[in-house]
Amino acid sequence: MDLANKAALITGAKRIGAVVGRELAARGVDVAFSYARSKSEAEEAAGQVRSAGRRAEIFQTNLADPGACAALVESAVGALGRLDILINMASVYVQRPFAEVTAADWNAVIDVDLRAAFLCAHAAAPHMRRQGGGRIVNFSDWIAKSGRPRYVGYVPYYVAKTGVIALTEALALELAADNILVNAIAPGPILAPPGTTGDELKAVEDATPLGRWGGEIEIAKGVIALVDSDFITGETIRIDGGRHVK
């Protein structure tokens, strides 16, 4: 897809989302970001897009609210005039022993990581269809793509991210006739969570064949490749430095 003068919506404007938005803007894309609480980071991400000469908007959105997803898409279309690319990046990440997981914990993760991806895609597809096509990029996880859990304490997260892979494949089939290509990224060790110790950093590096953390730009490169392609759909691509083979 020729990216010049297209419009994208990215759910999540922190760290990786900001870099993806910047790289899309560098290729001629206007970008809308949603954010939950990180307004300053969203404003900074929008500023980077504007610095590239493209339009940018930010929208505070509670993606756990089912009605908010359609409202977000309509706001993005209203601000940018069209929608060609949807990047479902927003995620809730909770670590808790299974015995302590409540229904509220389950819903908090499933509602944002899986249901919101479905609802945003559902709202975006008609706009893409009217323009002759579009691209949807969902976000899963390298462990979910591996087909088996590797760590305890992440039941809702693992189920949600595995569901994202199934959603991606189902939407790819449903929307192919409309030239809407649907794929997913399954990140591995990209950014260390805040508070990660030096020993923990090294342990991840030692477990990764390429021997390092990837950084935001590696995800942005993957997203650009998927939205640029005209013949990849239904795929979930691991960007994990080979972590899954070790």
Q: What are the residue ranges of the model-derived segments?
A:
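Catalytic loop of short-chain dehydrogenase/reductase
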Residues: 137-163, 168-177, 189
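C-terminal substrate-recognition "lid" of short-chain dehydrogenase/reductases
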Residues: 180, 215-239, 244
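Canonical Rossmann dinucleotide-binding motif of NAD(H)/NADP(H)-dependent dehydrogenases/reductases
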Residues: 3-32
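The beta1-alpha1 cofactor-binding region of Rossmann-like NAD(H)/NADP(H)-dependent oxidoreductases
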Residues: 39, 60-72, 103, 217-218
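Conserved glycine-rich Rossmann-like NAD(P)H-binding loop of the short-chain dehydrogenase/reductase
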Residues: 29-43
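A short, exposed helix-loop element centered on a Lys and neighboring polar residues
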Residues: 121-122, 169
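Substrate-binding pocket helix/loop in short-chain dehydrogenase/reductase
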Residues: 97-98, 105-110, 196, 204
